């Protein structure tokens, strides 16, 4: 794995306390608010007209949970992220035509949401470990792009 044993401990310890539904919905919602051009992939989700509409949108929350559940699964396979995310990479590349840069943006937003939720427990070493993970996941998701 690309994490040191200490970093792996930080990630495992904190992730056990993460509310996947809440954090996932918030992270995807923030992505759509902060980077409005990402909304074009979610036009079927209904009202995305204001930040409060986005953050309260049940479809955004549900998809955010789905995204973070997949991320959570990836944490069990840090030694094979490309294999773990191969199908999702293909889907987002070939079918949805998502700009792979969006995976990096979402990873960075996730780090911000975790910092907000965990405060002082999200120390610089913990942040550094999570930054490595979200970068690894973003790279794995971008893997199928030509």
From Swiss-Prot:
The modification N6-acetyllysine is found at residues 59, 82, 144. InterPro entries: Globin, Globin-like_sf, Globin/Proto, Hemoglobin_b, Hemoglobin_oxygen_transport. CDD domains: Hb-beta-like. One of its GO terms (biological process) is hydrogen peroxide catabolic process. Heme b binds at residues 63, 92. The modification Phosphoserine is found at residue 44. Red blood cells. Pfam families: Globin. One of its GO terms (molecular function) is heme binding. The modification Phosphothreonine is found at residue 12. The keyword Acetylation applies. The keyword Acetylation applies. Heterotetramer of two alpha chains and two beta chains. Involved in oxygen transport from the lung to the various peripheral tissues. This is Hemoglobin subunit beta. It comes from Hapalemur griseus.
């Amino acid at each position: 794995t690309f994490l040191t044993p200490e970093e792996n401990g930080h990630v495992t310890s904190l992730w056990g306390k993460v509310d996947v539904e809440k954090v996932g919905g918030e992270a995807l919602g923030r992505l759509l608010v902060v980077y409005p051009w990402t909304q074009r992939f979610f036009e079927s989700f209904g009202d995305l007209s204001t930040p409060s509409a986005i953050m309260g949108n049940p479809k955004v929350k549900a998809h955010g949970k789905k995204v973070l559940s997949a991320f959570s699964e990836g944490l069990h396979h840090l030694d094979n992220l490309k294999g773990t995310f191969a199908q999702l990479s293909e889907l987002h590349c070939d079918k949805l035509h998502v700009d792979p840069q969006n995976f990096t943006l979402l990873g960075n937003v996730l780090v911000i949401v975790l910092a907000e939720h965990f405060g002082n427990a999200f120390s610089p070493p913990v942040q550094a470990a999570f930054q490595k993970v979200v970068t690894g996941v973003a790279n794995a998701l971008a893997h199928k792009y030509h």
